[in-house]
UniProtKB/Swiss-Prot annotation:
Entry GO terms, CC: extracellular region; extracellular space
A Pfam family hit: WAP
Signal sequence bounds: 1-24
PROSITE patterns listed in its UniProt record: WAP (PS51390)
Tissue expression as described in the entry: Expressed by the venom gland.
Natural source organism: Pseudechis porphyriacus (Red-bellied black snake)
Name of protein: Porwaprin-b
Keywords for this protein: Antibiotic, Antimicrobial, Disulfide bond, Secreted, Signal
Main subcellular location of this protein, as a coarse class: secreted
GO molecular function: serine-type endopeptidase inhibitor activity
Domain WAP: 27-72
GO biological process: antibacterial humoral response; innate immune response; venom-mediated disruption of cell wall in another organism
Amino acid sequence: MSSGGLLLLLGLLTLWAELTPVSGQDRPVKPGLCPPRPQKPPCVKECKNDWSCRGEQKCCHYGCIYECRDPIFVK
């Protein structure tokens, strides 16, 4: 396979992996809540959703900041 064809295939696979399911069903949200943010750093987009974070971490949204954080659990 030519390098151009390989790059096209890689691009299509990347695009496919980023798309949500056609059925409209998103993955369920992970349990727990995001802890409060202690300070205000510059805008960062570390994640898109809970499933772009490792393990049990959640994708937490603080204004223009999206970052993976360990969840807190409230009784």
